[in-house]
Amino acid sequence: TSSFEENVRAAAAAGCEIMVSTDHLTLPASMDAPGDVQVTAADLPLHRAAFDDAVKLASELSPSLKLLYGFECDWYPGCEALVEAWSAGAAVRLGSIHWLGNPGDIMAGAAGAAGTESVPRADLPESDAGWIDYDADLHVWKNLGVHEVWRRYVDAWCSACESPLDFDVMAHPDLPMRFANEG
């Protein structure tokens, strides 16, 4: 991954006029307890401060470069209030699907937050719930098979499009292709 500063320097050098930040938004502990694939809730203020510093740098390096603060927001059943809270202040919400199935107790707290260490994981190996693009754990593919993963992915993707979150844009409608031959 790269920092905001690195991205601004590269964008300025390439003559870009607009750059949108879309790091992965905070997730519930039931989906990613250690916070490995996201900006954790505890890191959101530092993340925003780093973005604001990048805006200042962009104004020095390339005054015509406009930066937009955003997040890639995973959609999962019941996520709306959490996504709205965690993405507050974002100018862009990029909707995405990476998780299929029941996300578990999403209201038990944000990943990495104190007191969430004992929140049960929702992606148990025998379940049909979990990440579809995590190559270290392909249990969803093995348990459901390629066709069912695709079917559920399309259903979830369409649900995200119809969500009251009103995403600005939806990402990778073809994400299952990444592992379609693995399941």
PLM regions and their residue ranges:
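Short, acidic/polar
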Residues: 2-10, 77-85, 152-160
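Short, electropositive alpha-helical surface patch
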Residues: 41, 78-92, 183
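Acidic (Asp/Glu)-rich catalytic clusters
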Residues: 13, 54-62, 83-91, 161-165
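General structural signal for secondary-structure boundaries
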Residues: 3, 40-43, 47, 83-85, ...
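Short aromatic-enriched loop/helix-cap "lid" or pocket-rim segments at secondary-structure transitions
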Residues: 32-33, 81-82, 105-108
